[in-house]
Regions:
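Metal-dependent nuclease catalytic regions and adjoining charged, substrate-binding loops involved
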Residues: 153-205
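Flexible, glycine/threonine-enriched loop-and-boundary segments that flank and lead into catalytic domains
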Residues: 99-105
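Acidic-basic catalytic patches of nuclease active cores, encompassing PD-(D/E)XK
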Residues: 67-98
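Compact mixed alphabeta submodule
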Residues: 138-139, 153
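A structured, charge-rich N-terminal accessory region that forms the first stable segment of a protein
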Residues: 1-72
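Active-site beta-strand-loop-beta-strand hairpin of nuclease catalytic cores
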Residues: 107-126
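Short beta-strand-loop-alpha-helix junction that forms the active-site gateway
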Residues: 129-138
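Well-ordered, non-membrane alpha-helical segments in soluble/globular domains
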Residues: 44-45, 140-148, 185-192
């Protein structure tokens, strides 16, 4: 069983043509390889923000910025400013541990893992952090919300599911989607399964 990241699956849903196949094949060859020498700055920042919000102990962000590669320091500072600007829109923000679950499909599974569990002004949110430099389209934002809704709503009916596009300063709270998007996600999951199955067969041929 191959393991595909939540964000990588969202990228796959929005791609077309050869880029779509390349995305699935990258998942095939990278699955299970936890040693990634090309860790991007936003992955470090994501983990630091989760730790800070969970503990309530805010780090010295200037020290954190200086620890990043020089070419990533400006982008890291910009993302931090935008994150805390967004958070300042709320009078209160309390942490809770957000739900997580594996979405098991035919040839792969996806770790559905909203990183931030925040009670914002009394409303419980499970939030997927998006700090990537790639544009977050409305389709990907809706798809993320629908996947989380499908996975968690029955057990956690009071939670609002959202994706925070830090760079664009947009907070996408899922408020429902058309039946067509549900069918689209089923089709995209089947499409990725078909590509991964073909890659597996070719690898053993």
């Amino acid at each position: 069983m191959k393991h595909v990241g939540f964000t990588k699956f969202l990228d796959f849903t929005a791609q077309t043509g050869s880029a779509k196949a390349a995305s699935a094949l990258a998942a095939f060859y990278q699955s299970g390889n936890m040693q990634n020498s090309r860790t991007h700055y936003y992955e470090n920042l994501r983990e630091a923000l989760i730790t800070a919000e969970r503990s309530g102990k805010y780090t010295d962000w200037e020290d954190f910025i200086r620890e990043q590669k020089e070419e990533a320091q400006e982008a890291t500072r910009d993302a931090l400013i935008k994150f805390y600007k967004w958070k300042s829109n709320y009078v209160s923000a309390a942490w809770y541990e957000p739900p997580k679950q594996i979405w098991a499909l035919q040839e792969f599974d996806v770790n559905i893992n909203p990183e931030l569990g925040l009670i914002l002004d009394g409303e419980v949110h499970a939030i997927k952090l998006y700090i990537n430099n790639k544009k977050l389209s409305d389709l990907k934002a809706q798809a993320a919300g629908l996947i989380m809704e499908n996975m968690f709503h029955e057990q956690y009916p009071s939670i609002k599911f959202a994706i925070l596009d830090v760079k664009a300063e947009k907070f996408h709270v899922f408020n429902g989607a058309s039946e067509r998007l549900d069918y689209l996600l089923i089709g995209e999951a089947a499409h990725m399964s078909a590509i991964l199955s073909a890659a597996k067969q070719r690898a053993v041929a």
